[in-house]
Structure formats: C-alpha cells, structure tokens
A protein has these predicted regions:
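A juxtamembrane structural motif centered on a specific transmembrane helix
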Residues: 348, 371-418
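Membrane-interfacial loop-to-helix junctions in multi-pass transporters
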Residues: 69, 118-121, 274, 304-311, ...
Length: 418
C-alpha cells in the first residue's frame, strides 16, 4: 500500500497495471507472490536441511558476491546489482541469509569455544568478509547491516569489553566531526591528566598503569588526528562523508581535496542532496500531523518532492498519509515482530536455531531502526530498505526467507540441530 501511495499517478488503470508488470507496485505484488511460494517451499523442507547446508549456502553467497565485480550494472551510484533481463538482483541482500546460517552453524559446533579469542576472530571473519566485499561494490549501507550480527555473538558470550571499546571509538569519531580538532586534542590531554592524577597512588605502586594511560592517550589522539581524516579522505566516498556531516549540520571539510580539514567551512552548513532528502522527508512526515492526510492525498509524496520515497524514504509516505497514528501503529507492529522473534529464539533447544533466530532479529532491528532514524534526520542517509514495506524484490524475498526459515526451525524446536 505504501509503494502504491508513493508511485501511483492519477489516471493510471490500477487493475490493468497489476497484471502488466509496468508499475512499481505491480512488480512488488509479483515479488510478494514469489515470496509466498518460497515461504511455502521452506515450510515443507526438513529443518535439518538448513543446518546441514549452512556452510554451502555461505560459499554460494560469497561466490555470487564475487560475480558482481565482472557482471555488475551501475544503478544510482551502486555497483552491487546484477541484471537478468528485466530483473535486478542484489547479492549483498541475499547474502545476509547465508551469513545468518553460517554464523549459527559455527557457533553451534561442539568444538567452538566462544570464550577464546580465536573463536571470536573466526566468527568476526564470517561476518566481515562479505561486508568487505559489499563495501567494494559501493554499497556501504548494506555492509553496515552485517555489523548487526555482532549482537548474536554478544548473546553467545562475546565479552562486553569489546562492545564498550567499539562504542568509545564511535564516540571519538563523532567528537572528531563535531569538535574542532585542536580543541578535542586538548580535551583528550586534560582527560588523560585527570586520570593520572586520580590514580596517582596506584601508579606509584604499579608503573605499568601510567604506561597504559599514556598509550591510550596516543591511540585516541592518533584516531582523532590521523585515522578519521584518512578514513574520510581516502576510504569513504565523497557523498558518504557528506551524509555523515549532514547529520551533525556541518559541511564536508574534505570536499576541497586537501588532506587537512577546513574547520571554518565545516562550521557553515550548505544544503547537499542528502540533507535535501531528509529535509523533504521531515516536511512530509510533519505535514501528516496526527491522523494523516489519507491515502493518495499527500502533497509531498504525491508530487515527488521526496527523492527515493518508494525505497529508502518510504516511511515518510506512511507518515504523511496516515500521520502520527499510522506511524506509531507500524512501529508497534515492528516491535511486536521483534519481540516475537526473540521469544522464539530463546525457546529453542538447539544452539543453531537460537543463534539463527537472534541473527534474524538483529538484521530486522538494524534495518528498522536505521531506516526510520534516517528519514527523521537522526541517522546518516545510508540507503537501506524498511522490511516488507520498501520497494525492492531482492529485499522482500530476503526478509521472507529469513523469517520463514526461523518459523520452520521453530516447528522442530525440540530437535537439537548442529
């Protein structure tokens, strides 16, 4: 319905277009039918099949990702699409199913001891290898989705210290964007000095503590002064850096081609494409008010003021058409779905099924949280679909497979799969 509201043009023959495969909503309808058939096939499959072939599916997923490089078609800046006649297939979407199965398979192996660093590194490699291939296909948004699988590892015993370190690094990157570089370096130095002063008695007894504090100071300053600028200048693409700076209301200071950030210009915000998208999205959501304008009555979405309103920004179509009430109902349904997935995962006797269930919940949560936050300006524009709502055949089929494999595993939850 949201795709129909976002793409319907007045005067279009609705029922005829559904049969002719010419409009986005008719194409999505056909993918819905295909998804229903795949779901039926999954429900009729032996649950042992998924654990037995998990590694094979991972190999297939990686192989298809490699096929993208020689056979890709460039679509809207991304090189992650393979065309089959009139169809487009995005392997990075499908590979999420493969990673969920492979990670669950590895974590459920009797020989896997997840208290050891070696097991942590192997599990991380299973997740990060396809993510790295996806980055090379100019699809950073989908690559970030794979990071959601670290939630599964945390559930299975990944030390909280690793997540804390990752959070501190993320906070330091944000501070590098928001705070003037020299001021941030001074602040880090003052913090290190305060830590040394507070722990002065312990330092007298153990000199190694002083070495650790100084080393951490060097690491933080190195990240702030060298690692983050290198990442923004030489790793991420220009439009990706602009989206990150747009989130904090600043211009991209590296856009002039210099290695040193232009701090003065970054403090004055000019409108970019991504900031325009978010601005129009918030206008559309705000114009819906409490009850919404009604189906096909939204002005922002009906007249294409919001770019990508059928895919990445489809939540604004719901916000304008059905208002605050409709948005809350949709988010409530998502919360119920996530809670149900986690409940199903926790009641599994099999480690494989439990890990797979948490993998499904993690992927759904990341997509929902980031997509909604993106449309209201609380997250950078990274371009990931809203599950079961955004236009896209590959994403619809991927979410369908993820969910129905879990349903099939739950049907045999008394079995212990390995």
């Amino acid at each position: 319905m949201a795709i129909f509201a976002a793409t319907y043009k007045e005067g279009d023959p609705v029922w005829q277009s559904f049969l002719r495969y010419k409009t986005d909503y008719s194409k999505q309808f056909y993918f819905f039918v295909i998804g229903a058939l795949i779901a039926l096939f999954i429900l009729l499959t032996d649950s042992k099949f998924f654990s037995a072939t998990a590694n094979l599916w991972y190999a297939v997923g990686i192989g298809v990702l490699f096929l993208v490089f020689p056979f890709h078609s460039r679509v809207k800046g991304t090189e992650s699409i393979i065309r089959f006649g009139g169809f487009q297939f995005q392997p990075a979407e499908f590979c999420k199913v493969c990673v969920a199965l492979a990670l669950a398979k590895y974590l459920s192996q009797p020989e896997t001891n997840f208290t050891k660093t070696r097991s942590h590194l192997i599990a991380a490699a299973i997740v990060l290898f396809p993510a790295l291939l996806t980055v090379f296909q100019s699809e950073t948004g989908l690559a970030l989705v794979y990071c959601a699988f670290f939630i599964v590892m945390y559930r299975e015993g990944l030390p909280a210290s690793i997540l804390i370190i990752a959070s501190v690094i993320a906070a330091l990157v944000i501070a590098t964007i928001v705070v003037e570089p020299n001021l941030l370096a001074i602040g880090l130095t003052i913090m290190a000095g305060l830590v040394i002063y507070t722990m002065r008695r312990s330092i007298r007894r153990r000199r190694g503590i002083l070495l650790i504090v100084i080393s951490l100071w060097f690491v933080c300053v190195g990240i702030q002064r060298f690692a983050v600028p290198f990442l923004f200048k030489h790793v991420l693409q220009k439009h990706q850096v602009e989206r990150i700076y747009d989130l904090f209301g600043k211009d991209n200071p590296y856009s002039k081609g210099t290695d040193e950030p232009d701090v003065v210009s970054s403090s004055r915000k000019s409108e970019t494409q991504s900031s325009y998208n978010v601005k129009q999205s918030k206008i559309a959501i705000g114009s819906g008010r409490f009850w919404g304008k009604g189906l096909l009555k939204g002005t922002q979405t009906r007249y294409d003021f919001v770019p990508e309103q059928r895919t990445d920004f489809i939540f604004c179509t719901i916000g304008e058409g059905f208002g605050f009430v409709g948005s809350i109902v949709l988010l409530g349904l998502y919360l119920v779905l996530l809670f149900r997935i986690i409940t199903v995962a926790e009641r599994q006797r099999s480690t494989f099924s439990r890990c797979y269930g948490y993998g499904v919940a993690s992927v759904f949560f990341f997509h929902i949280a980031v997509n909604v936050a993106m449309t209201v300006g609380l997250a950078p524009v990274i371009g990931i679909p809203l599950p079961f709502v955004s236009y896209g055949g590959t994403s619809l089929l991927t979410f369908t497979i993820l969910l129905f494999v879990l349903i099939r595993l739950d049907a045999d939850r008394q079995m212990v799969l390995r």
